[in-house]
Amino acid sequence: MPKVEIYKNLFLDKIGKNFTNLEISELLEPFKAEFDGFDENSGKIKIEFNDTNRPDLWSYTGLARQIKTYLFGEIPYYDFFSKKGDFKKCYGEILVDNKMSQIRPFIFGFLAKGLIINDRMLEALIQFQEKLCQSYGQKRRRVAMGMYNSNFIKFPISYVASSPNHKFVPLGMDCELSLLEINEKHPKGLEYSYIVKNFDKYPLLLDNNNNVVSYPPIINSNNIGSLKVGDTELFVEVTGIDFEATLLALSIVACDFYDMGFEILPVKTVFKDPFGLDFEELVCPYYFQEEVEFDVKNVNRLLGNNLTLERICLNLKKMGVSSYSRDFKNYIVPPFYRNDFLHEVDVIEDVMIGEGLASFYPELPKAFTIGRLSALEEFSRNVRNLMMGMGFQEMIYNYMGSRKDFIDRMNINDQNFLKVSNPMTENYEYIRASIIPNLLKSESVSSNFPYPHKIFEVGKVALKNLDAAEGTSTFTNLAFLMSGKEISFNEINSIVATLFYYLNIEIILRESKATFYINGRGADILIEGFNVGSFGEISPYVLNNFGIFIPCSVFEVNINKLVSQS
C-alpha cells in the first residue's frame, strides 16, 4: 500500500488551520489512511494508505484538499477542464502516430506556469510522480508521467513509434545511447523496459525541432527532461494503455499543480488514427467521468439509518461530491480528480464517511447462522494428522518458482504450467503445478541431517485449463517424500496403502508413464477409473539435476478429487 512523507507545514498551510499530530491522525481515519509518525528533524509526516482507490490523496495538496472539503464543506472547482462539446483554448499540441495504437496508445498533457519551483515543492512532485506511477500506474505499465521545463520544448510535440536504434542522451548520463541500449544498460531501462521491449518499435516523444523529449515510460532526455529548482514553466504529460486511467492521472496532477498555485494551460492531443475512439482530438485536462444515480431508500437500507436527501447531499459535499435531483431521481457528479464511483454502493460509502463512522452503532445480526469448515478443509486436516501420525514432518512452500526447478530439473514439459508474463525475477516465474519439485529442493539441501527423511505438504497447485472461465484450475494436493538408503517402491507403497486404508478409500494402481520416475517403479492411483495422483521412485537423472545422491520416493494426490470420491 502507498506510503508518503509530506512536509507538515506545507500540508497545514493548504488546509488553512493548525492541528496537532493526534488531530491529524484522527482526520486521516475516514480516508483509510494512518498516521505513521512525525520526524522533527525533517518536519515530515509519514502516512500510510490502506487502499489504492484514491490516488488523488497521495500528495500533500490532494490530501489537504480532501480534509479541507471534509471540514468546511467547500467543493473546489477547476475551470481549466474541457468537457464533451466544450473544449477549452489549447496552448500546444501533441500529435500521435497511428502506429502507437498497438504499443502505448494514449498520451495527454498540459502546461503549468506562474510559480517558481522550490526544493520542497520539487521533492513533493517527484515523490507523487513515483507513487502515482508505481501504485496506480502498475509500475508504469498502465500509466506513467513525465515533467519537463517547457522553455526547452518547441510545440507541437510528436508521439511516435521509433526504431530501437534511435539515439539520444538519457537522463543521468552524458553519452548517447540507442533505445535498445537504454533497455540493456540504463538503470531505468533495466527496470521498466519489459513494458515495451517486445514491440518492433518503441515510443518516443519528439518536439518540433526533432529533439527527443523522452522515451516513455522509461526515461526522459537529459537535455530537456530534467526538472530543476527555479523552473517556472512546465510541461506535464501522462502516457498509458488505459484511456480513463491515463486521463484521470493527468486530471489529478493538474488539480495538484493548480492547488499549488500554478496556472494550468490546456494542451490538445491529436490522434491521426483514432483506433476506435469516438473523437480525433481531445483538449486536456478533460472531464470524462459519468454521473451515478442513487436512491435514498437504498442508502438508508444499507446504512441502517434514516437520512434525509438533504442530509445525504450534505455528507456527499463533505467528500467533494456534488449531487442534484432530476425527474424524481438523484445523481452524483464525481469530482474532477476521482473516478472510483462504479456503482451506487460507492456513493453510499461516501455518504457513510461523510456522516462519520462514529455515527453508526454495532448491532447483533438478525439472522442466525452456524459457521463450519468446508468438506475440503476437514479432509485436509484429517490427512495432515494421518501424515504426522506416520512420522512425517509438515513443510510449507511458496507457490511460485523457477522454470529450472519446476520443469527442467523434473524432466517434464511445460504445457500445463502457468507462467507470469512480467516476472520481477526468474526465481518466481511460474506457478507450481506440483508440490514434488519443492520437496526435492528441500531434500537437496538436507544431506547433513540423519536419514531417513520424511516430509510432506498439503498445499495449492494451479494448472492451465482453457475450458475454465479463468483459463486455470486450482487444486489442493497432498505430496510427500521419503529418502534414505533403504527407501524403495515397496516402502512407499506400504505408506500409500496405510494412508488410503485410514481414509477408507479403495484405490487401483497401474504403471505410471511419468518421466521423473524410474521406469517400472512408478504407479498411477485410480479411484473408480479416475486418475487422482501417482507415486514412485525418482529417477537418478532427476535426482542428479537436484544434486541429490540418495534414493528418494515421492507421492502426490489431488485432495479435491479424493473428497469428491469419498
From Swiss-Prot:
Q: Which residues bind Mg(2+)?
A: D340, D346, E349, D350
Biological processes, Gene Ontology terms: phenylalanyl-tRNA aminoacylation
Keyword tags: Aminoacyl-tRNA synthetase, ATP-binding, Cytoplasm, Ligase, Magnesium, Metal-binding, Nucleotide-binding, Protein biosynthesis
Q: Which domain of life is it from?
A: Bacteria
Which chemical reaction does it catalyze? Answer: tRNA(Phe) + L-phenylalanine + ATP = L-phenylalanyl-tRNA(Phe) + AMP + diphosphate + H(+)
Q: Which Pfam families match?
A: B5 (PF03484), PhetRS_B1 (PF18262), tRNA_synthFbeta (PF17759)
Q: Name the EC number(s).
A: 6.1.1.20
Question: What residue stretches are annotated with the B5 domain?
Answer: 287-362
The record ties this protein, via CDD domains, to: PheRS_beta_core (cd00769)
Q: Which PANTHER family match?
A: PHENYLALANINE--TRNA LIGASE BETA SUBUNIT, PHENYLALANYL-TRNA SYNTHETASE BETA CHAIN AND LEUCINE-RICH REPEAT-CONTAINING PROTEIN 47
UniProt record similarity statement: Belongs to the phenylalanyl-tRNA synthetase beta subunit family. Type 2 subfamily.
Q: What is the designated name of this protein?
A: Phenylalanine--tRNA ligase beta subunit
Native source organism of the sequence: Borrelia garinii subsp. bavariensis (strain ATCC BAA-2496 / DSM 23469 / PBi)
